[in-house]
Amino acid sequence: MAGHSNSMALFSFSLLWLCSGVLGTDTEERLVEHLLDPSRYNKLIRPATNGSELVTVQLMVSLAQLISVHEREQIMTTNVWLTQEWEDYRLTWKPEDFDNMKKVRLPSKHIWLPDVVLYNNADGMYEVSFYSNAVVSYDGSIFWLPPAIYKSACKIEVKHFPFDQQNCTMKFRSWTYDRTEIDLVLKSDVASLDDFTPSGEWDIIALPGRRNENPDDSTYVDITYDFIIRRKPLFYTINLIIPCVLITSLAILVFYLPSDCGEKMTLCISVLLALTVFLLLISKIVPPTSLDVPLVGKYLMFTMVLVTFSIVTSVCVLNVHHRSPTTHTMAPWVKVVFLEKLPTLLFLQQPRHRCARQRLRLRRRQREREGAGALFFREGPAADPCTCFVNPASVQGLAGAFRAEPTAAGPGRSVGPCSCGLREAVDGVRFIADHMRSEDDDQSVREDWKYVAMVIDRLFLWIFVFVCVFGTVGMFLQPLFQNYTATTFLHPDHSAPSSK
């Protein structure tokens, strides 16, 4: 008996719930038919009691996602929710007549909508992407939140790329109604970020909104939002800037590379070609504008100028390196400046302090001076044309070649006639000795020219290092001192836009 009672109670509750659902559905259906009755409602008519009454539309943008910013095409793609609120006196009812129902959702295409569009659209899609339902309250207030994917025109400032900050505006205005019929009001001073999905390329700095009027045209009004965004430079730093800096450092090594290896010009040209490739990559990213040059483009041009300068200096250094006494004479000031003064300033050890070849050459010349007279000819009108002074100790193995006689030329020396064959041999030895001394002197001059080239290389090495370091730091620190604020990007013409 108790089970039968429980079953009856459950059946009664289910029946009551179904009846209430049917009644609720019937109530909402009656309300929708009442509101959208063609005899009392026309969606083509502006909701105003007379022609002079204004319809106030409150507008607010909620940013859901910053999809992309195409620098070359200068287009910003965003996913936004465009909140619009207004009142329609024709869509009112008494809640007590409809089971205290105070809100109802109506298809937006069946009611009057303010034709608010994005004025600075860049792809022809001026309206929203999806016409969602509108929430209508019993007092006639309407809340409409359609989502939209907009592609708006955005003037890209490339001056500090890739450490740049952009201001992309979105201007909303009624397409057919002017200010005498629809008054656009800014619901919030900033766009909402409650449902924003962070971007991997841009940081949102500020999203201020403002209502613009034109003093010269009383019928003009629009709502403008400034999307102030800053680029995240990590991607371009890793893939563009650091490789450029490393390639530039290779250009520094050109001055440290010995001139004898013959690869100076090859390295310079290779670095120049690599920088040219990076410059071509940048030209495909930034917009083709002549108003500003991007920061990374300036840096590449700076390094290309330095590399070109290194090519010119390398040519000059190679020219100096391969000079010889037969083609050039070293001026005294060159010896003073490049062989005595600059090596000390550039932390180079002077070659005469460390060159073993120079020390050996000096010792050999000293021995030649000490051994002079071991075998020499005496010439003059009183001398026999085939007479020579002889050191007996040095010609013990030449017995019979001549007859020595004591002479006053010095102790241990004698004089006597010698054969013509011996004289030819002595002349040959003298020629060889003179030739070797001449070659040794020429080699000394060539080594001096090589050392001058090395000093010039080291001088330009330090100059190149300082210019590269200070130039790089000066260029890339410049954007860090820029004070970006919301007012920085507000253009003067925003306070008085032209009439459309």
From Swiss-Prot:
- Indicate the secretion signal residues: 1-24
Membrane-protein topology: Multi-pass membrane protein
Keyword Signal present in the record's keywords: the answer is yes
What PROSITE patterns does the database record attribute to this sequence?
NEUROTR_ION_CHANNEL (PS00236)
Instruction: Give, from the UniProt record, the effect of changing residue 83 to V.
Output: 3-fold increase in affinity to the conotoxin BuIA (2-fold decrease in K(off))
Positions on the Cytoplasmic side per record topology: 259-266, 321-458
Where is the site labelled Key residue that may interfere with effective access of the conotoxin BuIA to the channel binding site? Answer: 83
Q: Which UniProt keywords apply?
A: Cell membrane, Disulfide bond, Glycoprotein, Ion channel, Ion transport, Ligand-gated ion channel, Membrane, Receptor, Signal, Synapse, Transmembrane, Transmembrane helix, Transport
Q: Known InterPro entries for this protein?
A: Neur_chan_lig-bd, Neur_chan_lig-bd_sf, Neur_channel, Neuro-gated_channel_TM_sf, Neuro_actylchol_rec, Neurotrans-gated_channel_TM, Neurotransmitter_ion_chnl_CS, Nicotinic_acetylcholine_rcpt
Give compartment(s): Synaptic cell membrane; Cell membrane
**Molecular functions (GO terms):** acetylcholine binding; acetylcholine receptor activity; acetylcholine-gated monoatomic cation-selective channel activity; heterocyclic compound binding; protein-containing complex binding; quaternary ammonium group binding; transmitter-gated monoatomic ion channel activity involved in regulation of postsynaptic membrane potential
* Phenotype when changing residue 135 to A: Very small decrease or no change in inhibition of alpha-3-beta-2(V135A) nAChR by alpha-conotoxins PnIA, GID and MII
- Role summary: Component of neuronal acetylcholine receptors (nAChRs) that function as pentameric, ligand-gated cation channels with high calcium permeability among other activities. nAChRs are excitatory neurotrasnmitter receptors formed by a collection of nAChR subunits known to mediate synaptic transmission in the nervous system and the neuromuscular junction. Each nAchR subunit confers differential attributes to channel properties, including activation, deactivation and desensitization kinetics, pH sensitivity, cation permeability, and binding to allosteric modulators.
Q: Which NCBIfam families match?
A: LIC (TIGR00860)
Assembly, per entry:
Neuronal AChR is a heteropentamer composed of two different types of subunits: alpha and beta. CHRNB2/Beta-2 subunit can be combined to CHRNA2/alpha-2, CHRNA3/alpha-3 or CHRNA4/alpha-4, CHRNA5/alpha-5, CHRNA6/alpha-6 and CHRNB3/beta-3 to give rise to functional receptors. CHRNA2:CHRNB2 and CHRNA4:CHRNB2 nAChR complexes exist in two subtypes: LS (low agonist sensitivity) with a (CHRNA2/4)3:(CHRNB2)2 and HS (high agonist sensitivity) with a (CHRNA2/4)2:(CHRNB2)3 stoichiometry; the subtypes differ in their subunit binding interfaces which are involved in ligand binding.
Q: Which PANTHER family match?
A: NEUROTRANSMITTER GATED ION CHANNEL
Q: What is this protein called?
A: Neuronal acetylcholine receptor subunit beta-2
Species this chain originates from: Rattus norvegicus (Rat)
Its taxonomic path starts at: Eukaryota, Metazoa, Chordata, Craniata, Vertebrata
